[in-house]
């Protein structure tokens, strides 16, 4: 929003340990925030004095100050208010404890803390991860961020899990820099769609990231911050326990659910694993099913088209014969029909060939780094994603939307449940 555009201006004077919260729900409205004096931060990233920051539709923002500040808000948010009750000081105390563990790890030349954030949906898990990561980087650390939430896909797109070395704070209105993330294709937005495959991917991602920690001294001492899904009962709880074991987690922060906290105290807490209960922020907003679907769609749109800095994806044709398309998992067979020596679970991680058809239209396909199906395709990380925008059965050609020009870097493609209607 430029200075010559109309828009009501409101000044907010924030006292010590308070935050300005606002939400953007409607149309094409934008809000610009400027720090006029004092110090303030957004989820651990410091605001620069007198620099305007722009937020668009869907933004749910909480700007916090430890020492007091004045903020100018320009535009018409749906809701804007100052909150004096905030758990930020508790979050900072947890970060101080993590930093103490990192300093100790540096002195002893051992691995730094591996911390996992858990809790039900809409309690602020990814926000708390962002706060911990930003604070760590501001102190000169280089932690690895792991995202196991296939529902929102904070590192790549929904339907994936991944890891990223964080080297600088996230820009105020965007996420962390996406250079060279390690991403694995799951293909669904809920782990319950294929629990066996999801666990196998967690094991593979843990093995790879723990190896990477050992190989990079600065990252090794900095440790990891792990974000998880909001499914915390039954199968979801099993996945939390599995992730804690595979990543060799030594700190678990439980947001806003005492039942989960007590279960983890019973099943995980020990001399080597601390379990800490934290309240959620009052600024956390419950999302409807349609808001979640819209957020997923926006993540995929950003992947192809960018957000603040527009990207220009490529559209080109690929012959059916030039690619091999698979999905992971086949329908479960009764025990009596299984081949000798095969377990029922094996079906869930089986590679099943998919014949090109109109059913692929609008589907997201992951481009695997695997060069042949002799490799372990399901546990190979992915180079990126494409979207099928047209299927010509007569010419035997797929038209695809791709972030890179032709040719595709590899020819093994994995089908995702996710679809994207390209409206550009």
Swiss-Prot record:
Keyword annotations of the record: ATP-binding, mRNA processing, Nucleotide-binding, Nucleus
Entry keyword annotation includes Lipid metabolism: no
CDD domains noted in UniProt: SIMIBI (cd01983)
Gene3D superfamilies associated with the record: Clp1, DNA binding domain (2.60.120.1030), P-loop containing nucleotide triphosphate hydrolases (3.40.50.300), Pre-mRNA cleavage complex subunit Clp1, C-terminal domain (2.40.30.330)
Gene Ontology MF terms in the entry: ATP binding; polynucleotide 5'-hydroxyl-kinase activity
Residues the record lists as binding ATP: 19, 60, 122-127
Entry GO CC: mRNA cleavage factor complex
InterPro entries named in the record: Clp1, Clp1/Grc3, Clp1_C, Clp1_C_sf, Clp1_N, Clp1_N_sf, CLP1_P, P-loop_NTPase
GO BP terms, alphabetized: mRNA 3'-end processing; tRNA splicing, via endonucleolytic cleavage and ligation
Family: Belongs to the Clp1 family. Clp1 subfamily.
Role this protein plays: Required for endonucleolytic cleavage during polyadenylation-dependent pre-mRNA 3'-end formation.
Record protein name field: Protein CLP1 homolog
């Amino acid at each position: 929003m430029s200075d010559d555009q109309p828009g009501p201006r409101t000044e907010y004077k924030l006292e010590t340990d308070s935050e300005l919260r606002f939400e953007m729900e409607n149309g094409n409205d934008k809000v610009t925030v400027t720090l006029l004096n004092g110090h303030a931060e957004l989820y651990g990233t410091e605001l620069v004095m007198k620099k305007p920051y722009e937020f668009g539709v869907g933004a749910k923002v909480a700007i916090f100050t430890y020492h007091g500040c004045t903020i100018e808000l320009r535009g018409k948010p749906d809701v804007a208010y100052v909150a004096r009750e905030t758990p930020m000081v508790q979050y900072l105390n947890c970060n101080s404890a993590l930093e103490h563990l990192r300093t100790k790890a540096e002195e002893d030349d051992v691995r730094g803390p591996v911390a996992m954030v858990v809790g039900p949906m809409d309690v602020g898990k990814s926000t708390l991860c962002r706060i911990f990561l930003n604070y760590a980087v501001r102190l000169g650390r280089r932690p690895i961020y792991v995202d196991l939430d296939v529902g929102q896909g904070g590192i790549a797109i929904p339907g994936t899990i991944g890891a990223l070395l964080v080297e600088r704070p996230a820009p105020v209105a965007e996420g962390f820099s996406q250079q060279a993330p390690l991403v694995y294709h799951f293909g669904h937005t809920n782990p319950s769609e294929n629990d066996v495959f999801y666990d196998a991917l967690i094991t593979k991602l843990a093995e790879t990231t723990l190896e990477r920690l050992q190989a990079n001294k600065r990252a090794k001492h900095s440790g990891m911050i792990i974000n998880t899904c909001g499914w915390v009962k039954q199968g979801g709880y099993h996945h939390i326990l599995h992730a804690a074991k595979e990543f060799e987690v030594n700190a678990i922060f439980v947001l806003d659910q005492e039942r989960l906290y007590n279960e983890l105290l019973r099943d995980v807490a020990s001399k080597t694993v601390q379990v800490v209960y934290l309240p959620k922020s009052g600024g956390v907003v419950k999302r409807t099913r349609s808001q979640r679907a819209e957020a997923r769609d926006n993540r995929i749109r950003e992947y192809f088209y960018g957000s603040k800095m527009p990207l220009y994806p490529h559209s080109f044709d690929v012959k059916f014969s030039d690619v091999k398309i698979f999905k992971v998992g086949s329908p479960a067979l009764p025990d009596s029909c299984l081949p000798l020596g095969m377990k029922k679970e094996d079906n869930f991680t089986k590679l099943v060939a998919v014949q090109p058809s109109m059913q692929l239209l609008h589907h997201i396909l992951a481009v695997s780094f695997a060069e042949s199906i002799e490799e372990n395709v399901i546990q190979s990380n992915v180079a990126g994603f494409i979207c099928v925008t047209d299927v010509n059965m007569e010419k035997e050609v797929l038209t695809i939307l791709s972030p890179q020009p032709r040719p595709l870097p590899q020819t093994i493609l994995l089908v995702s449940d996710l679809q994207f209607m390209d409206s550009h």
